[in-house]
From Swiss-Prot:
It comes from the Eukaryota. This is Intraflagellar transport protein osm-1. Pfam families: TPR_IF140-IFT172, TPR_IFT80_172, WD40. WD repeats lie at residues 14-53, 63-103, 110-150, 151-189, 191-229, 233-273, 511-553. TPR repeats lie at residues 700-737, 803-836, 848-881, 907-940, 979-1012, 1037-1070, 1137-1170. It comes from Caenorhabditis elegans.
Length: 1737
């Protein structure tokens, strides 16, 4: 954008005359300038001053100069100006939309301090900033002002976000506060060092120009984005700022300079443009940017105002519209014909790439990268919506205030002036006649706006969508296809016409449809009215009031209606008559009435009604004007309207309201209609009582609200309101209500009030008094006391009887146990159901009678279907059947009849029911009933009557005999035939099996179609024959079309073609040939057609079908050369030669060579003539023609003569002719082929010297082939014999190549194999050559080839041996499997021996894995052997070799390696390996200190064995289970001991594990286990110290027994109540070292004299050792953590258990002291149990 000085608007004055504010109207048509003399100058859109008015002070007594104008802004609708003044007031002036309107104050807001700044974001709300720091909001309608928030600093600026979602206020202390409209919250977002007087709010945040010569950019959150500092430049302080309408550009003004900043979407930042300097401007204090973005107005301190042009570039469209780009996203379009301007702006800030003018040059379409902008140049409104244009969209501009975009079956509605789409629908019917949309203009009040779309969902269904809420308002289904629809202007009615030209009017709100006109050729709403004009024939129909569609005005016209035109004075229908266009004028007065109401011109509407008082609908029209006038606050007009219809009450009421309004206007200003009492009274008049109540309550006028209801006798609403508001006189109000009810005789209403007060007894009396016994009964039932009061209930019952509510009286008497009266009144009230229900237990004998009476009652009232069941209950089946029949309940009637015992009665009913089913068409059921009733003839007649002859025949045959039936039906058929009832006769003929009679009948009367139909159905084999017969008949009669049809249907299209050919109807013949006969047939007929007409006509015909060339060829092929010459001469002269050649060819075939040669020459093909004479050996004529016409063929003539000489053996003459023909190469080739080598060399040397060397070489090769050169000769000879097919000589020659003739082994092998191939192919029947070849192959060591030959010779065994010698094992095995299966093992054995001897293990594995593994083991390649065994996926094989290797490693005492092997390959459950596992366990546990890693490895191996044994259910499972438990407990204890005793839980857990290990002393080192358990118990102390003594004492006994070698010395009696083994094998040596042993021995001895030790096991509540699993009840499961028995607090972990407390302790220990070994234990337990460990709660 560039800034350019444009012009001076107001000249500067000599002294100070500051322009305080410049404001531009949102519609771009005006600009207001606040001058120093307290006046406001108004400029038009061209910057010319058109008006000026002076501002007023808050009070005239202060004088006209008692204030200054501080701020000013336009309203959103541009019709008002708000002016803030220093004398604490805000005035709103109405300036209107035209220049001649008077400027009046419409709102006055008195403020507590001076108004410093303004912003007007919404029509009804204005933001006010004040000197005292308050930010207030003014409500325009109520003329009230309230504070939004308050600060202590003056408000220096207020700016609203472009999208009106929030605003910011700037204050004297530099703070900026953001207020959000939706959340109604404010927050301080930043604070500047200087007051932010110059502030704008853009789409990209805040821009502030400060007095310290800086321009700052902030985000909405107060974060600094950019800073432009001009302190280092010759710049003065910034004095004003303005933002363009797109909020993409900002201009900042200083002393004499304007600086431009533009937002860069690409950079996301502000870019500074070139500044504009204005000399002598002297401080620009005010800026205003026109809404079209083209001009900036700048005001100075000296009172001068000038304009600045803002433009990027300019251009022209259609030589009429000037485009001015004020920004990439803002274009001004100026129509140079009338100087109107239109803004095209992208509110998204996108660059406008393309502009198009559409819709009769009224509408502008702007395209951006991702949106589309549509602008109306007349209304100056534009809209932008997101759109990805593919260039295929269509635009419909036929509708007011909106545009339709059609794209890919979607209809998008765009309202001018509103961004985004108004709505969209999907339909394939997108013609503008099938779409109608009505969108109200911006001048319509919000609550009256209409936005509706009518469209076709399918050709017969109309949908009407409310575009405001997106809901479907109406869905209209029509019987036929609709071809035109249109909504009226208010979208309250819809007109549509269907394709049968019927016009229908639909009232959308009531869905009422009225057919207005049939055979309609034109229909239209009169513009800007609800009048309908339609034409049908020469009749023009007008509906002036569509609400009364029956009131139609008709006039005769003499043409077709073209259009309906309307202006201010008249409305005319333009009719195109035969001679000219004629205008028929409509009653414009009636139309104007509706238009006046639409425009709210009530005075004009009243004037119309006053001049038309005699109309039939005048009353409704006065009412309509009155209601609309009231709605728009025009009370005088409303009063006049009500007076016209003599509604005195409303006239008086309006008079009172007007008096109140006049009084209010004095106090609050305006016309007083905004006064709350006026608004409330108007709401009361409109019966909007809740609205009036709300208005009163908003003003805290409770008395008036309640008084309104009481005056209207709406006591309930008054009481409800009083109760909600806690009205102090509520009780008095209620008393007044009761008194009023009593005075007016409203006892029932009083009773309701009594009920609500809880006085039920009084309420009941009042209900009875008001003759409302049901309400009394309801009140009594709701009172637990009164519902049991017999007197009250009898009073109510009597009242019910008086009111003839007998059924309710019966209920009361039933409650009183007076069953007789209850039943009596139930019957009187026809409540038979209740009577029967009561009688079932009170009077059972009356139930049947009551059922009968109930049935009779239902029958009496016509409820026959209900009566049926009651007659059945009363066992009156006849009445039941009759009721069912009268109710037309035929199935029910039939079921009842079947239960009647009297056959005679039943038969009568069957007939009646059968008649029903017969009439209904249920013939099968009717037949059954007729037969059941014995009415056979009725059944037969039924079928005959309904032309069901087959069924009639069947029944007749069944009941009257076949012969009689056939005779009767044949006669009937013939009779029908004679009377022309052929269809019925046909059915009868077919029914009796005589279809030929029907065929003959139809053939006789000439109904060929029926003949064909019956022949096809019953004699299909004669169908083609019949059709051909008919075709011949038609042909004879001259009906060739019918004949053609039958020929074609018979598949004989050739006959049809011949028929037309014979009749010379060539076009028809050609048509059939083309469609039925294929391409060849088509051509034949066409050529025959052409031949028949000849000449130019034939050429034209063939050219028409593009067949001229093919026609010439066809003529030639058929010998019609005269026709061919004619066609070529006339239409294709270039084909004349071809015709001559074709004729010459035919003449040659006929032997007429001389004539043929002439035509060859005329056809420019003399060479063909020469060739013809050569073929005929006529050398003279051939030489003559060649010399005359084609000398190039003379060599061919001579060559032919030479060939003849060669054939005769005259070589010399042949040589002469060939040399004359200059073809020495031919005679050379002849001499070579005949091996005449000297002659060949002579010719080559004399005439072809370049070939002499080659001939010499060939001469030498010939000698070689003849055996002159040894082995090479043999090879050459063999090759030559092979080429000649002399296989024996070829083989003999090849076999001569052997060690006797050469030392070249490769040549010998190749020659021998070649000889064998020849023998196999050609000499397999010659044993001599087979033997010779085999001998040679054996000598040459060609075993594979020998095997092939032997196999062909039938020597399978020798062939297999040969393959083995060739080491072709696979082939040998394959051959053996096919021919000698018994040799397969022998071959495999030889193969294995070969592989083994050659050491080829890889191949041996594939053949014999066991042998291969054994070889690896022999080579000590155990890892490779085990990997190979593992790869076989056969576990026993792997286990075998693992066991072998483990045994070897054990023998080597390499136990670590044994563990590694078992871990890698798995431990098997083979008992042979058990000793190894036992050894591993013993050796690992025999070490002085337990190593967790080693124990864990042994434990893991045992787990593998454990799992395998468990799967096999092995007898060794228990043995390994005990070993695994022992290893597990030792491993877990070892892992825990690493933590130490610092954790209290660890010591107890280790103790329990040690005690649990005692049960495994028979498989562990006994002395060690007892020692460790005793030491743990001793160290733990407390109750376990005695146990420690007992166990350590036993340990000493074991040591003594070990030393003595006598296990009987050990006493196991202390362990009787435990599972500690008593038979334990003694170790060979003591485990503990002597020092510790002596120490422990001393402690035991010292403790033995202490009586404190009980010297016994620790027992639990079971009475056994606490670590023992076994007790009297059985064996408990061990705990996974301690090994203790789990008796209670069981936690199930997979397949195992744990005691909850010990499990939790263990897991807590792991969590608080994570070690690698503890985690390993946890993982092992989870794997063993099959479930992870988790803390149990």
């Amino acid at each position: 954008m560039k800034l350019k000085y444009l012009s001076t608007i107001l000249p500067a004055q000599d002294g100070e005359a500051k322009i305080s504010n410049i404001s531009c109207s949102p519609n771009g048509s005006r600009a207001a300038i606040a001058c120093s003399d307290r006046s406001v100058a108004l400029l038009d859109e061209n910057g010319v001053q058109k008006d000026r008015f002076t501002c007023k002070p808050i009070d005239a007594k202060y004088g006209k100069k008692s204030f200054t104008v501080l701020c000013m802004t336009f309203s959103p609708d541009s019709s008002r100006i708000a002016i803030g003044q220093s004398d604490n007031v805000l005035f709103i002036y109405k300036v209107g939309t035209s220049w001649n309107e008077k400027k009046v104050i419409v709102n006055k807001f008195v403020q507590p301090s001076a108004v410093t700044c303004l912003s007007w974001p919404f029509d009804d709300k204005i933001l006010v900033g004040q000197l005292d720091g308050k930010v207030r909001i003014g409500l325009i309608k109520t003329n009230k002002c309230s504070s939004l928030y308050k600060t202590d600093e003056t408000v220096v600026s207020i700016q609203t976000h472009p999208k009106r979602t929030s605003f910011v206020s700037a204050h004297q202390d530099g703070s900026i506060i953001l207020y959000n409209f939706s959340s109604r919250t404010q927050s301080k977002i930043c604070t500047l060092q200087v007051p932010p007087y110059n502030l704008v709010f853009t789409n990209h945040g805040l821009v502030v120009a400060t007095s310290d010569r800086r321009v700052l950019s902030y985000t909405e959150n107060g974060v600094v984005q950019q800073q432009f500092d001009y302190n280092d430049q010759s710049e003065k302080e910034f004095s004003s700022i303005s933002c363009d309408p797109t909020a993409q550009n900002v201009v900042v003004a200083s002393y004499d300079r304007l600086r431009l900043f533009s937002w860069s979407a690409r950079r996301g930042a502000w870019d500074e443009g070139a500044p504009l300097e204005i000399q002598n401007a002297y401080t620009i204090g005010a800026l205003g940017w026109k809404m079209d973005g083209s001009t900036i107005y700048a005001g100075t301190v000296c009172g001068g105002v000038f304009s600045v042009d803002c433009c990027l570039r300019r251009g022209m469209l259609k030589s009429r519209f000037e485009t001015t780009y004020v920004a990439p996203s803002h274009v001004i379009l100026r129509d140079v014909t009338n100087d109107t301007r239109t803004n095209v702006i992208s509110n998204k800030g996108l660059a406008i790439d393309e502009l198009k003018i559409m819709g009769k040059d009224r509408y502008v379409i702007g395209y951006t990268s991702s949106s589309i902008i549509i602008a109306d140049t007349e209304s100056q409104r534009f809209s932008e919506l997101e759109w990805q244009s593919g260039g295929h969209e269509k635009f419909y501009f036929d509708f007011n205030n909106c545009c339709l975009i059609i794209n890919a079956g979607e209809v998008t509605v765009v309202e001018y002036g509103v961004d985004g789409s108004l709505g969209w629908v999907r339909t394939e019917l997108t013609s503008p006649h099938l779409l109608s949309v009505q969108v109200s203009g911006p001048d319509v009040e919000e609550h009256k706006k209409v936005k509706k779309l009518a469209y076709l969902v399918d050709p017969t269904t109309i949908s009407i969508i409310n575009l405001i809420n997106g809901q479907q308002e109406s869905f209209i289904n029509h019987t036929g296809a609709v071809d035109w629809i249109e909504l009226n202007e208010r979208a309250s009615k819809l007109l549509y016409r269907d394709k049968r030209s019927k016009v229908t009017l639909v009232d959308i709100s009531s869905d009422q449809r009225s057919v207005l006109l049939s055979f309609c050729t034109y229909v239209q709403w009169v513009p800007m009215s609800d009048v309908i004009v339609a034409q049908s024939g020469d009749n023009l129909s007008i509906w002036y009031n569509p609400d009364l569609p029956e009131q139609v005005t008709n006039m005769k016209i003499k043409g077709e209606v073209e259009a309906v035109l309307r202006d201010a004075d008249r409305t005319e229908v333009i009719v195109q008559e035969p001679t000219a266009k004629v205008a028929y004028e409509l009653d414009n007065t009636q139309i104007e009435f509706g238009a006046a109401l639409e425009k709210r011109d009530f005075d004009r509407a009243v004037a119309f009604l006053e001049s038309n008082t005699s109309g039939t609908d005048a009353y409704s029209m006065w009412i309509r004007v009155a209601e609309m006038a009231l709605e728009h606050g025009n009370l005088f007009v409303a009063q006049r309207c009500y007076a016209a219809i003599n509604d005195v009450a409303k006239v008086r009421k309006l008079h009172d309201i007007l008096e109140i309004a006049d009084e209010a206007s004095i106090s609050i200003g305006g016309d007083g209609t905004h006064f709350y009492k006026v608004r409330a009274m108007l709401a009361i008049m409109g019966r909007k009582f809740k609205e009036a109540e709300r208005i009163f309550l908003e003003q805290n006028d409770t008395e008036s609200a309640i008084g309104m209801y009481t005056s209207l006798h709406k006591w309930d609403e008054a009481l409800e309101l009083a109760k909600v508001l806690n009205y102090p006189e509520y009780e008095q109000l209620k008393t007044s209500y009761l008194r009023a009810l009593s005075d007016t005789g409203q006892d029932s209403k009083a009773a309701e009030l009594k009920v609500s007060d809880g006085d039920t007894l009084s309420a009941i009396q009042l209900y009875i008094k008001s003759n409302k016994p049901l309400s009394a009964l309801s009140a009594a039932n709701n009172d637990s006391v009164l519902s049991q009061d017999e007197n009250i209930l009898r009073q109510i019952a009597d009242s019910l009887v008086k009111s003839q509510l007998y059924d309710k009286a019966g209920d009361v008497y039933e409650k009183l146990k007076d069953f007789d009266k209850a039943v009596e009144y139930f019957k009187k009230g026809d409540a038979y159901g209740k009577a029967i229900q009561l009688a079932r237990f009170a009077f059972p004998e009356k139930v049947v009678t009551l059922e009968q009476e109930w049935g009779l009652h239902l029958e009496y009232i016509g409820q026959y279907d209900a009566a049926v069941n009651h007659f059945v209950e009363a066992n009156d089946l006849k009445k039941a059947v009759e009721a069912a029949i009268r109710a037309k309940e035929w199935p029910k009637a039939l079921s009842i009849v079947e239960n009647i015992q009297d056959q005679k009665v039943r038969t009568g009913y069957y007939g009646e029911i059968a008649d029903h089913y017969s009439n209904k068409g249920d013939f099968e059921r009717a037949e059954r009933l007729f037969v059941e009733a014995g009415l056979f003839n009725d059944a037969i007649m039924m079928y005959g009557k309904n032309n069901k002859w087959i069924d009639a025949f069947r029944l007749s045959e069944e009941f009257h005999g076949r012969e009689a039936t056939i005779s009767s039906y044949l006669a009937k058929a013939e009779d029908l035939d004679e009377h022309g009832r052929f269809a019925e006769a046909e059915q009868l003929y077919i029914t009796i099996g005589m279809p030929h009679k029907a065929i003959q009948m139809y053939d006789r009367v000439g109904r060929d179609d029926d003949v064909l139909r019956l022949v096809e159905r019953y004699h299909g084999e004669h169908m083609h024959e019949t059709r051909k017969r008919f075709a011949t008949q038609y042909e004879e009669r001259g009906d060739l079309k019918a004949a053609e049809e039958q020929f074609l249907k018979a598949g004989d299209f050739r006959s049809a073609v011949n028929m037309y050919k014979d009749s010379e109807m060539w076009s028809d013949a050609y048509r059939i040939a083309k469609t039925e006969g294929g391409e060849n047939m088509e051509k034949q007929v066409l050529f025959m057609w052409a031949k028949s007409i000849g000449g130019d006509a034939a050429v034209k015909l063939l050219n028409k079908h593009g067949m001229l060339m093919e026609g010439i060829d066809f003529a030639c092929e058929t010998g019609a050369f005269d026709l061919a010459f004619d066609l070529a001469r006339i239409g294709a002269k270039d084909r004349m030669g071809t015709v001559h050649v074709r004729l010459a060819t035919q003449l040659e075939e006929e032997g007429r060579l001389e004539d043929a040669s002439k035509h060859y020459v005329e056809g420019n093909k003399p060479e063909l003539a020469v060739e013809m004479f050569i073929r005929d050996n006529d050398w003279a004529d051939a030489e003559r023609v060649a010399k005359d016409h084609c000398e190039s063929l003379l060599p061919d003539v001579y060559t032919g003569q030479a060939r003849r000489a060669i054939e005769e053996g005259d070589h010399l003459r042949a040589e002469t002719f060939l040399l004359r023909a200059n073809k020495p190469d031919i005679i050379l080739r002849y001499f070579i082929e005949n091996e005449m080598w000297p002659d060949a060399l002579r010719i080559a040397q004399n005439y072809l010297p370049h070939q002499a060397a080659l001939i010499q070489e060939e001469y030498e090769k010939s000698e070689l082939r003849n055996g002159a050169r040894g082995v090479d000769s043999f090879v050459a000879q063999a090759k030559e014999w092979e080429q000649q097919g002399d296989w024996r000589k070829a083989v003999s020659a090849l076999l001569k190549i052997n060690r006797d003739s050469t030392d070249n082994d490769a040549l010998i092998k190749h020659s021998t194999e070649k000889a064998a191939d020849l023998v196999m192919k050609f000499l397999m029947g010659d044993e001599e050559y087979i033997g010779a070849a085999l001998g040679a192959l054996d000598e040459a060591n060609c075993n594979e080839k020998a095997a092939e030959l032997l196999l062909l010779f039938g020597q399978s065994r020798q062939a297999i041996n040969a393959l083995c010698r060739a080491k072709q094992w696979a082939k040998a095995k394959q051959v053996a499997q096919e021919y000698l299966p018994e040799m397969v093992p022998e071959i495999e054995k030889i193969y294995k021996e070969s592989l083994k001897s050659e050491g080829r293990l890889g191949e041996l594995i594939d053949v014999d894995v066991i042998t291969a593994i054994d070889m690896m083991i022999e080579n000590d390649q155990w890892d490779k052997a085990l990997d190979t065994a593992k790869s076989q996926n056969y576990r026993p094989l792997l286990d075998k070799y693992v066991a072998q290797y483990a045994a070897i490693l054990v023998h080597r005492n390499d136990l670590s390696r044994v563990l590694a092997v078992l871990e890698r390959y798995g431990a098997s459950a083979n008992p042979a390996n058990f000793s190894i596992y036992k050894l591993l366990m013993e050796e690992t546990l025999a070490k002085p200190r337990f190593d967790y890693t080693e124990i864990a490895r042994v434990r893991n191996v045992h787990l593998d064995v454990y799992n395998a044994l468990q799967k096999e259910s092995s007898e060794h499972f228990e043995e390994f289970s005990r070993a695994l438990w022992a290893l597990h407990l030792i491993a877990m204890r070892t892992a825990l001991e690493e933590i130490g005793d610092s954790v209290p839980e660890v010591q107890k857990l280790c103790l329990k594990q040690s005690l649990s290990l005692l049960r495994y002393t028979d498989i562990l080192v006994a002395d060690r286990i007892f020692y460790e358990a005793g030491a743990a118990a001793k160290d733990y102390g407390s109750e376990y110290e005695s146990l420690g003594f007992l166990l350590l004492n036993h340990y000493l006994d074991l040591v003594d027994a070990i030393e003595e070698g006598n296990g009987e010395l050990v006493d196991y009696s202390p362990f009787e109540n435990s599972d500690i083994p008593t038979e334990v094998s003694l170790p060979t040596r003591q485990w503990l070292e002597s020092a510790k042993h002596e120490e422990m021995k001393e402690w035991v001895l010292a403790s033995s004299v202490d009586d404190a030790h009980a010297k016994e096991l620790v027992y639990d509540k079971r009475g056994v050792f606490e670590a023992s699993l076994k007790d009297k009840r059985g064996t408990a499961e061990p705990c996974l953590v301690t090994g203790y028995p789990v008796i209670e607090s069981t936690v199930r972990i997979g397949s195992m258990v744990a005691e909850k407390d010990n499990l939790n302790k263990f897991l807590v220990v792991i969590k608080s002291n994570q070690t690698e070994n503890l985690l390993n234990v946890q993982n092992f337990v989870a794997k063993w149990a099959g479930s992870p460990l988790a803390i149990s709660l």
